């Protein structure tokens, strides 16, 4: 009797296979990094072949570490770095070009040309996203325009597109020998090509971008049996697909309207469940699909993306040498009582949500002779909390929903000083769950739900447990005084790049 659910978590820097029991505990996992390819400034690529090879390797590794075989697994789910774009030959499985990664900015000119008629928000009413290099549509267009023979092959139906979820699902289910060509609604919602209301490809946008519809995968729910795995997981249903931030929402069991989670990594991503209602953003957030389970209606979310949070701690370590490991930032910050009156706004490459200002650059303001490295470390941590507050304010403004608590995950949630200050500056409790691997867990949940391993979302919610809660300890007057200072500091970053 199979008693575990598996997840393949294909991230920006590494690939993992993680196996969970019915209570949502990690039984075993394996992880491997892959190469980051930088052919030119601003260009970032991955080898799709290497990613598929790593995926097979971590599946083998995880099964072996747990002493398990395919017959022990009820279903496998996939979660992935979103927006990263692959175009490959349907007959051979060979990519026509490397995967163009979400951070890659080569499509800047394509985006500017598209924005010349109708502005940056030209497609936002239909797709919920601004025109930006971040999303897949312009990346597909670049490959069709720049790889010899790619456009003709796409029109003939010989080459196909997929994000990483689609590429892995196709290979897992047989590749050139009957592989299933699908993507789920969450990944499709990051292409700029899917209409958020119909949950189908938008022919008008495809026409404007010059992308043949026949190269696109079929859009499917996030939880259903898409096909059966071959190879290491032979016979196991492939039954769940979610983009990484959406998978974290499911892993955190944010199933009710108004529930939110914030993932603290290199940058930070906050998502708020808005239910079956599409909420357009007037405050610089993205409207996206949160999940769709089987034939139930799609659930939507607002997303706030922050470019630099954890990366600022790395900067303190690598560029200034004030600490030798990221974990030391907490002890350094705790040498002082407060920030000594300074604010650090990390607009190293402009500001993301809610400003979207590419002309901004980083500043440290309020310096006096009194300030020391402890104050600097504290200001670095506080910058993460202030940026999160700005996104939260934008979410409350757009949705009309008042947040009562924030669920958190990611690497920085083990920093108590930061998490306490986060609760203080938001004025709501901040909650860290027992199982921190929320992204992988979300993919396993989606797959297990499709085959009845978990019968409903209530069973998943029952698995979710609190590891630690930080409650606000700051009075309202102090909170607002500090936040006013931050808002003033942010204005000092504008209009720097001419």
UniProtKB/Swiss-Prot annotation:
PROSITE patterns: FGGY_KINASES_1, FGGY_KINASES_2. It catalyses: glycerol + ATP = sn-glycerol 3-phosphate + ADP + H(+). The keyword rRNA processing does not apply. Glycerol binds at residues 82-83, 134, 244-245. It comes from the Bacteria. Sn-glycerol 3-phosphate binds at residues 12, 82-83, 134, 244. Inhibited by fructose 1,6-bisphosphate (FBP). InterPro entries: ATPase_NBD, Carb_kinase_FGGY, Carb_kinase_FGGY_CS, FGGY_C, FGGY_N, Glycerol_kin. ADP binds at residues 12, 16, 266, 310, 411, 415. GO terms for molecular function: ATP binding; glycerol kinase activity. Keywords: ATP-binding, Glycerol metabolism, Kinase, Nucleotide-binding, Transferase. Pathway: Polyol metabolism; glycerol degradation via glycerol kinase pathway; sn-glycerol 3-phosphate from glycerol: step 1/1. Pfam families: FGGY_C (PF02782), FGGY_N (PF00370). This is Glycerol kinase. The gene is glpK.
